Structures are given as C-alpha cells and as structure tokens.
Amino acid sequence: MEENAQARERLPPTVTGLSPTEGVPGTQITIRGENLGNDQSDVIMLFICGIDSLWSMKWKSPSKIIARVGAASRGPGEVRIATKSGGKGSSNVKFRVFITQIGPLEESAVWVDETRTVPGREAIRSVPQIQDERDALGLLPSQKRMDQVLLSRDFPDCSGNLRMENFSPQWYLLENHADATIEDLRIAIKNMELSKQNEAKRSEEMHKANLYSLINCVDTLANLHQALEKGENADHFAALKNISKLIKDSKSKAENVFADVLKRKDDADATRNALGVIVRFKFIFFLSSKIEDSMKKGEYITILNDYTRAKSLYADTDVPLFRELMTEIDEKMQVFKEEMKRKLIDTPVSYEEQSKLIKYLKILDPESDPTWDCITSYYVWLEKSLWDMQTQFLEKAKLEDLENQQRINSQNHLITKTNELQNFVTTLVELLLSKLPSFWKLANTYHNSTASPDAIQRLEDINQMLTNIINVSSWLILNALVPKALPDMVLKQYGDQFAKWPTVPADISRSNLQLSLKTTRSLISSLLENQFSLTHVQPLVELCMTARLKLLSDFVDCGVERVALLAHRINWKQDILDRAQQTKTILPDYYENEICECLTRTRDALSISGYPGEACLFSRERFRDTIIDLFVHLITSIKICFDRLFIRQRPQQLAQEPGQKKGNNEITTKKLLIAVGDIEFIIAKTLNNVGKKMQECGVKHVDQIQEKSRAKLSAFRTKMINDCIAMMSSAFEPLIASATYEYLPDDDDISDYAKEMILCSVLQQAELELYAPQLAIECLQQTVSNALDALLLHFSRLNQDTSPLIVTQIVIDLTGLEEALSTYATLAIRVQINTYRAGLVGRFDNQRLQQCLKNMRTTMRMALQSLEQHAENLGDDSHNTSNI
C-alpha cells in the first residue's frame, strides 16, 4: 500500500473541473482534479489564462485548489499547474474570460473608454507613435560629444533641442555628429528626405483612419445646408426658433441626465490627477520620513543627496503644498545639522568619520567652519580625558594600596600584583597613540583647505594646542614615575591637579620606569612617523631623557647596594695567582659579576635606538659629569663593602648577632692585607674587564671613568695600607714604653724589649709574606721607621744625666735594633740613629757594645736570618713590591 501511495504521489497533476467556468478578471474559482500537490508548498506553478495566479492560490486537498483569476485578456484559456512531487500537469477544461461593458449611466470608479461602444470612436491603432529619441539625421550618435559650455559660448541664445524655437542646426551637428564625414552627411540628407515622405504618408494614413468621422461631418454639414436652402418662407425660419429652443431644452435635459456621470468623471479625473501627482512627486512627499530613517541608520550621504535634489527641484516653487513640504524638510535638515555637530563635537570619532561629518556640515552650511569647531572641541576633550584618566587610576591605586596594607596587617602574604601606576602610563600612551594622529591630520587638513584671513593665527593656536596636550601628557607620566623631577613652574601652574601616587617598592619602581621608557619611546617613534615635528615631541623627548637618567640612577643604586651586600659572602680565603705572588679572595669575582650584571641592566637606558634621532645621555654636557660620577660610584662601591666589613659603616642588618663571637667582626691586619690584595686585583684586572663591558653596553668616556675609579680605589688602597701600618706600628708602642732601663740585663746582651721588637718585626714579616707578599717591604719599611723613630723620641725624653752603664745599654739596644732591622731601616732613620749615637760618644763602653752585638747575633740567629733572608730578595723589585 505504501508503494501504491508513493506511486500516486509521483503522478502528474490533472485538472478535471472548474467552478465557475467563466468570469471577469478577479473571479475566484475552484479547481478540481487529481494529484494537485501534497501541501501548499508542493505547488510551484499555477497559470490561469496565461496569468500567474500562484500568489492567490489556497491549497485545500490533493483534489481541490482555490485561486483567483488575474488580469487576463478576454477569451478562453488553459489552467496550467506544476508540483514538486508530480511535475508538470495537464488540463481537460478551459476557463473563459469576458469583460463586462459598463453602460453610460452606470456608476464606475474610472472613466469608461467609449471607443468600443460609440460609433466613430474607434481608437487609432494603425498610426505609429512618433519616436522622440530618434536621430534627426538618421545616423548613429557620435561617441565623442562637444562640451556644452563651449557650444553655449559659440552659439549664445541657441539650443540643440529639436522642439525648441531657438533650435540651431550647427549646435545639433557639433553636439551629436562632430566627427561625421561628407559621406555621412550625404546619407543624412537622403534620410531626411525619406523621413519627410514618411511624414506625408503618415498624415495620409491618419486621414484614412478617421475617414468615417470626416465624411460623416461633411455629410451632416451638407444636409444642414440643403435644409436651410429649402426654407424659403418666413414661417419656416420662425420654426427654427422653436427648434433652437427644443435643442436647448434637450441639451439641458441631457446635461441633467449625465450630470451625475460627468460629476463622477470630474471627481475621478481629480483623484487620478492627485494620484498622478503623488506618484510623480512621491520623492518630496516621503522625503521627511526618509530623512528620519536615514538619520537612525547613519546614512548621512543619502540624506544630503536627497536634500540637494529636493532643493534643486522645489527651492523656488510657487505651489503652496510643495512650499509647505520644503519648510518641513528644512526643519528636519536643521535637526540633522545639529545632530551632526553634536556628534562631531561631543563624541570623539575616527579621522575618517570626522572628515565625513565636516564635509556634510560644509555642504549644509558653506559659511560655517566645522573643522575649527572640531579641532577646539577635540583638544578640550583630549586634555580633559588625560586628567580624568589620572583620577581614575589614582583611585584604583589607592584601593590596591589599602588592600595590600590590610593583608600585611592581617599577616596575609597574598599581595595584589596589579600595578595601576604602570597601567595608567600604558593607557595614557595608548590614548595618545590613537587620538593624536587624528588630531594632527585634522589640523593639517584645516591648514591646507582653509582660506580664512585668521589662518596663520589659527595655525599657531593649533600648534599651541598640540604642545599643551603633549606637555600635560609628559607631566602626568613624569609625576607618576619621577614626581620630584616636575619643574616648579609646572607645579605652580597646576597646583594640586597632579596626583600623589602611593609609594611603591624600589624593584616595582624600576620595572615601571623600564616599561614606561619602552612605551614612551614607542609613542615618540609613532608620532614622528605621523609627520609630527621635533618641536611637538620635544616634551616627550625630555620625559624620555629624564626617565633614562632616573632608571640609570636606580640601577646604579641597586648595583651599589648589591655590591655592598657582598660583605655577607666573603670568606677571607686567598688564592695566589702568579709568580708575583699576587693574592685575592673570591670577592673580586663576585664584585665583577655584580658590576657586569648592573651594566647589562642599564643597556636600555643607554640605548639610542628607541626612536629616530634619540640622543645619547652623554651628549648633554649638564648630564655628562653626573653620569660619569654615577658609574664611578658604582665601580668604587667595593669601598662600601669593605667599610661594612671593617665595622665603619655597618648597617642594622649586619649588626652582631647575640651568639656571634666578637672577634669575627674586629678589624685586623690580616683582613686589611687581604682587602688590599683584593683592591689591587680589582685595580689591575677587574677594571679592564669592566671597561670592556661598559663599552659593550654603550657607556661613553670609559677611559675617564676608569681613571677616576682607579684614582679613588688607589686612594682607598693607600688608606687601608696606612691603617695596616698604623696597626703594625701600634704593636711596638708598649715595647718602647717598657724601655725605662730601671733594670739592666744580667749578661752582655740587648734588652728584652729590643728582642721583642725584633721578634715582633719577624712576626709582621711572616704575616705580610703570607697574606700580602707584595706589600712586605713597603709596610715593614714604614713600620720599622715608625718604631725606631718612636724609640729615638722615647730616648730623648729620658734623663740625660744617666749613668754610663745605662748609656752603654741604650747604645747597645739601639745599635742591635739597627743591625737586626737594617733590611727595612731607611736612610733617614739611620741618619737619625747615627746622629743620636754620635751625641753619646765617650759616654758608653765600646768593648762591651761589640761583645753584646756578638752575643745578639748568636742568641737571635734564626730571627736575624729570617730578616736577612728577605733582604736577599730585594734585588728583584717586581717580586717584593706592589704594582699599584
């Protein structure tokens, strides 16, 4: 059964009956048949008498459809139907269309065409219509046409229109056939002669078509003439008066009979004329509502085109209706103009949109200056946006700072990482990048297009506006990054308008500076690409320079602090490097790493590739000395490290812990000697490596920086050596003070204090050889000289009236010390000793002196050999003196 149903569905439709089978156009008929579709959408075609009736079809069932006959012509016609399921169908019946003839007295909505009902009113069908668009010469129009302006100048008060009274053949030929040849013109003459003959034939055909009316009219006139000739007596002419009266009465009755019909005709004609006017001039009638719709859609160019067209057609009309319509349209256009002004001034839009709005406003009001209004409003909006943005981000920053403080107080270490200060700088730069190019393009467009007498003054005003915007932007960024760098004049001008941003940690501040420097450079580069002058971007250049200096200073301060913190990492273990027995600890390596890392971080600040024409920091003389001093401070920061080690400038974090031994923090000659070795290594080796790194990072005047740093480090080295010598010399002070000679030695020998001074020198020599062999001679010479000088000063204070035994012992001790310490005794101290000894000649026992010296050489042989062994190496200065 399903197969039969499917087969039935695929059969073509067949029309077997219609109800009714005839009728006028618009008659609703019922179509019956088989397989007339499965539903409404299945029927895809329905033609009744050749007219598409699918639009009026209502599907009822596969065997019934209701439809309405369209505007078909009279006569029988087929019903053609097609479906998706069955395809094209067939019809066994036909529908006949007839046209109902309206009588002369029947009411009708339209005037009845009487050409078919009244004899002699046949329509003229055989007369061809005149082709208005045909060429008068019968030639094809030329593709090249002369300009109307030139023709108007050559043929004033003439026209090329064939229907005009001032028609000029020359104009017509030049306009339509300027490139015609002689042969073409000859053909044109033949065409015009043939056209003239055709016109005569056409007139003859017109008379033939109306021959019945003409003959009927002539016959009627002839019959009337004959009747008049027959009326010979006066009575007949008197009857004519009655006839005239009867004719008038019949005319009056006829008019009364057809009054309603004629009135309806007049009303129909008036309605038809009104509809014709509405259809013909519907553009002006619907223009008001169309303007409103176009305003909602933003189709401004459509509004302007329609308004321009209406203005050209109806601006000077005398028709009251059209004048009223134009008044309403003008009011709508005034609203439209105000809307465009508001959009142009109140809302910042893209440059393309601004240009369109300015163009439209200029078309509506040529005397206005919308470009200048847009520039001034754009400037006010942009400056206000900058200050509003600062307020907005300041509130966020304060809220973030408050939340962080609350978390810290509640011992919650989850601190918000949002950096509103950096977000403010980034957003401000993005605003300038998106809006300043549009402002500049707008200003250039105004300058190139305006012919105002105030153009020069307004150009200066525009430059001042642009400078003010960039100045405010740079000051806002500077206030956020380096508030102390704001000029006093700016602070005085703007007062409290600048925000007081919450304090941020040093590492976040450096990060902000680094990112802000990058975004500022990008801003300058983009503005220069958009043809901004260097004068305009100069405030941003100064901002960039200040940020670079601040960033460089912060990185140097950070590097100095990191070098100072190396005091935690020193272990006082030395390595001997070369034959010169130069020594160092791990500290110089740590120091070099920190310095190089700091220099690497300053690479961005020193770079000159951020934007075209970026100046080097060293190029400005007022910055050069400051930057050189910064790098010198960085390199010589090792002094701070040693100062903290020697408890000279020890911060709180290096304070002695309760369980720590006190001796670990005390300054000793050992630490001083090791520190001197590290300083010498830094001066000799590390400074050269640091200089190469500075050159790689873009630092200028490296030689000057190295020279100043070397001088300061050398002075620091000398100071530490002097401190070491002072500490070594202080070891002799109690020994010298004990030389009172109240008790003399029991045997022939030098005094105990002299022996201890010799042994002290040996110990100092050993310490120097162990920790700073290159300083042994320098330190021991100065120490021995200081000790002997102090001893001589001490002897000079003794009582001069001493006994010969005491004098002899003094000479023995002094001579023994001179002999034992001769390696390090300078010529000056020897002269002083000889002078002092010469003053005692004759007061001491020379024989006992020689015996005591002999005994000293025996008893202190090892100590003397140690001192003499070092003296044997004096020949090679490079192995016993420092290279610094």
UniProtKB/Swiss-Prot annotation:
Residues 13-98 form the IPT/TIG domain. Residues 178-206, 846-874 form a coiled coil. Residues 1-11 have a biased composition (Basic and acidic residues). GO terms for cellular component: exocyst. Residues 1-27 are annotated as: Disordered. It comes from the Eukaryota. Keywords: Coiled coil, Exocytosis, Protein transport, Transport. One of its GO terms (biological process) is vesicle tethering involved in exocytosis. Belongs to the SEC5 family. Component of the exocyst complex involved in the docking of exocytic vesicles with fusion sites on the plasma membrane. PANTHER family: EXOCYST COMPLEX COMPONENT 2, EXOCYST COMPLEX COMPONENT SEC5. The exocyst complex is composed of sec-3/exoc1, sec-5/exoc2, sec-6/exoc3, sec-8/exoc4, sec-10/exoc5, sec-15/exoc6, exo-70/exoc7 and exo-84/exoc8. This is Exocyst complex component 2. It comes from Caenorhabditis elegans.
